[in-house]
Amino acid sequence: MAKVLYITAHPLNEEQSFSLAAGTAFIETYKEEHKDDEVIHLDLYKEEIPHIDAHVFSGWGKLQNNKGFEELSQEEQAKVGRLSELSEQFVAADKYVFVTPLWNFSFPPVLKAYIDAVAVAGKTFKYTEQGPVGLLTDKKALHIQARGGIYSEGPATDFEMGHRYLTAIMNFFGVPSFQGLFIEGHAAMPDKAQEIKEDGIRRAKELARTF
């Protein structure tokens, strides 16, 4: 049985969001095809994801100086404890499905906060004399991304930094398989928006059967 983290980073719902429409189709089909797997949905707009701030640095510093967790302030305990929960949950999963829009050439900031929470030395990667080495070598990941313009080819290609960033992070973590499913052009070609959406949903369902 595999454990799947279905990670969505969009404030709207599947009726309003092309990425969530494809993501919902993917995960529903996945559940039908992999009935023994456990799927955990993390809606990053609803989850408590602490930003790495002064309280977090202070708490980490105290722990590194051999102070007990109970010696941290209440706010330090809450933030450091939650960050630890998120990173442990991430490491325990077998598969990751990220669902995002493309906003200002990247993804919503809640996903960056989440990546910061799980990018932990000793858990998702380690430092060696040869440099950092990823530890998640038995995982696989997928990024479902909707983007209103055309970024797969043409002059805007270099401006797409959301999927490129996730590709770099998954590689840094050692994840050997990272796929992308893109729904694009619906804002540039509004007369074809419904067709583009339906095609994205179809491709998402197909991919779910073999992911």
Swiss-Prot record:
Its EC number is 1.6.5.-, 1.7.1.17. The keyword NAD applies. It is an enzyme of class 1 (oxidoreductase). GO terms for molecular function: electron transfer activity; FMN binding; oxidoreductase activity, acting on NAD(P)H as acceptor; oxidoreductase activity, acting on NAD(P)H, quinone or similar compound as acceptor. It catalyses: 2 a quinone + NADH + H(+) = 2 a 1,4-benzosemiquinone + NAD(+); N,N-dimethyl-1,4-phenylenediamine + anthranilate + 2 NAD(+) = 2-(4-dimethylaminophenyl)diazenylbenzoate + 2 NADH + 2 H(+). Binds 1 FMN per subunit. The keyword Ion transport does not apply. Pfam families: Flavodoxin_2. Its cofactor is FMN. FMN binds at S17, F18, S19. Keywords: Flavoprotein, FMN, NAD, Oxidoreductase. It comes from the Bacteria. Homodimer. NCBIfam families: PRK13556.1. Quinone reductase that provides resistance to thiol-specific stress caused by electrophilic quinones. Also exhibits azoreductase activity. Catalyzes the reductive cleavage of the azo bond in aromatic azo compounds to the corresponding amines. Belongs to the azoreductase type 1 family. This is FMN-dependent NADH:quinone oxidoreductase 3. It comes from Halalkalibacterium halodurans (strain ATCC BAA-125 / DSM 18197 / FERM 7344 / JCM 9153 / C-125).
